[in-house]
A protein has these predicted regions:
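Adenosine-phosphate binding glycine-rich loop
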Residues: 39-40, 282-286, 302, 429, ...
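Extreme N-terminal basic, low-complexity initiation segments
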Residues: 2-9
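N-terminal Rossmann-like NAD(P) cofactor-binding subdomain of oxidoreductases
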Residues: 356, 386, 398, 407-412, ...
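Glycine-rich phosphate/diphosphate-binding loop of Rossmann-like nucleotide-binding domains
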Residues: 276-277, 281-403
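N-terminal ligand-binding/catalytic initiation module
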Residues: 17-278
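Rossmann-fold NAD(P) dinucleotide-binding segment
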Residues: 391-400, 409-430
């Protein structure tokens, strides 16, 4: 009775929508032109286009230039009262008129990038289930195991060239965001187009839904993903294997960018696939490239060489090790032995200074676990043999680094004592607090300048406002992956590369 009637009505409505979306001439219909973000030009359609495609009367008669549309978009953007509101406005604009969206981003990168990407994208992920309007990208659930290739074929574009994929387990420094981590692939791919001109139609954001350990999300009725604990171990790896194989089958010319996977998975997954398929991990290789580029810049500013640097990493995860590995490769390329280069990299993790004999170190850290028996330790500090140094200021005194790089997501880890020690040891200390978002940064630029009498060479992971000093306005260098991965992606597409190799990232760092 009523169920049958409802289904019949739904079928009729569906048929009507299909009919509206069809054009007898084979050209796009008015419906398609106005509701497909990649075709819609709004009031910029010319008179002849309006006549040809049946748009007369569907939009106001005034024909607008792109400049006029940009003025309106800027006005509407600035009318939003919060950064999250601005993010939602840009997201809606991308859904409605893609060409205008990218024109707006390109018109003022400094203004719009912190909204479409870090730091605002972090808040957008945390509230994704509450602000989600129109789905973007693909959500591949573990409930579809054995059918991932079939699911990927549902994507309407058949020649996808770039996928940014996350499992949502470690979004920026915010932890497990589940499928709400989709904001990261969306934001990354927006920058591929805005910064490097990669056609948006060949890019696909993907989130792998393997559950979430975020209890707040599991109890939230508006959370759009699976409300179950995460899978792990062989079950997890099998799902990733199926995804990678499905991409190769459905989109054989596609490069995969792994994004925001946890430390325990990021490096093993990269090692598992890097020599088999076209892929890279931006958190490891992209971060490394932009950090090494920052070191090159710092060397130019203080008239030193890369081989003069001794780096202390606050944080010992995949990002830190990625930077160290690329730094070592750079030094080896300049003629230094690998052993000598490794000796210039020191790490502090959640248990203290990493050293030989420290238990339960992951394999990727073993080569950076130095023998510390010959080092001079501060009076009253642990020897480092039986127990590690846990105070960062003590580690600075022992290691005497020329550069400190923060990738720990521990806010204010570079405190006044640490920074003043760096300034005492070095005429111009290199200090890079790279953790995202801004709330997780190891220090603020204004503190770094104040504690070093404006001698510090600073670059940050998230954007900070310029500093007014006695010498004038100081713009804070941003050491963000967005300066690297769009160009690498465009290079992969343009060259038809079948693998992404480390020398691509060293070359990018040197440019």
């Amino acid at each position: 009775g009523s169920d049958h009637s409802a289904k019949t009505t739904q079928m009729k409505v569906g048929a009507m929508i299909v009919a509206m979306n069809q054009s007898t001439s084979g050209s796009p219909s008015a419906f398609q032109l106005l509701f497909d973000a990649r075709l819609n030009k709004g009031a910029a359609f010319s008179e002849s286009e309006r006549e040809q495609f049946g748009l007369v009367g569907l939009i106001p008669d005034g024909i607008e230039s792109m400049d006029i549309q940009l003025d309106r978009a800027r006005l509407q953007f600035e009318q939003q009262s919060s950064d999250l509101g601005k993010y939602q406005f840009l997201s809606a604009l991308q859904d409605r008129q893609e060409r205008l969206f990218y024109a707006l981003l390109r018109s003022d990168f400094q203004r719009y990038m912190p909204i479409v990407y870090t730091p605002t994208v972090g808040e957008a992920c945390q509230k994704f289930g509450h602000i989600m309007r129109r789905p973007k990208g693909m959500y591949l659930s573990m409930n579809r195991r054995g059918k991932l290739a079939q699911v990927l074929r549902n994507w309407p574009v058949k020649d996808v060239r770039f996928i940014v994929v996350t499992d949502g387990e470690r979004i920026l420094g915010l932890g497990d965001q589940g499928v709400c981590g989709m904001g990261i692939p969306i934001g990354k791919l927006a920058l591929y187009t805005a910064c490097a001109g990669v056609p948006p139609q060949v890019a696909l954001p993907v989130v792998l839904d393997m559950g979430t350990n975020n209890e707040g999300f599991r109890n939230d009725p508006l959370y759009p993903g699976l409300r179950v604990p995460r899978i792990g171990g062989d079950e997890y790896l099998s799902f990733i294997d199926e995804f990678v194989a499905a991409v190769q089958e459905v989109f054989p010319r596609c490069c995969i960018q792994f994004e925001d996977f946890t430390n325990k998975n990021a490096i093993p997954l990269l090692e598992r696939y890097r020599d088999k398929v076209c892929c890279f991990n931006d958190d490891i290789q992209g971060t490394a490239s932009v950090a090494v580029a920052g070191l090159f810049g710092a060397c130019r500013m203080n008239a030193t060489k890369m081989s003069d640097q001794r780096i202390l990493f606050m944080g010992a995860g995949s990002a830190a090790v990625g930077i160290a590995d690329l730094f070592v490769k750079q030094l080896c390329g300049d003629g230094m032995s690998e052993a000598q280069a490794i000796e210039r990299c020191w790490f502090v993790n959640s248990r203290g200074m990493v050293h030989a004999g420290m238990p339960k170190l992951p394999d990727y850290l073993q080569r950076y676990a130095h023998d510390v028996s010959g080092l001079k330790f501060p009076v009253g500090a642990p020897s480092g043999l039986d127990s590690p140094l846990t105070r960062l200021s003590d580690v600075v005194e022992v290691v005497r680094p020329t550069a400190s790089i923060g990738v720990s997501t521990v806010a204010h880890a570079f405190n006044e004592t640490v920074v003043r020690a760096m300034a005492r040891i070095n005429a111009r200390p290199i200090i890079f607090p790279l953790s995202n978002p801004t709330s997780k940064s190891e220090a603020t630029p204004i503190d770094l300048y104040r504690w070093t009498n404006e001698k510090a060479l600073v670059a940050t992971g998230s954007p900070f406002s310029p500093i007014v000093s006695d010498g004038g306005m100081v713009r804070i260098g941003q050491c963000n992956n967005s300066f690297i991965f769009p160009g690498v992606g465009l290079g992969v597409i343009a060259s038809g590369a079948c693998r992404v190799i480390d020398s691509m990232f060293t070359a990018a760092a040197e440019v």
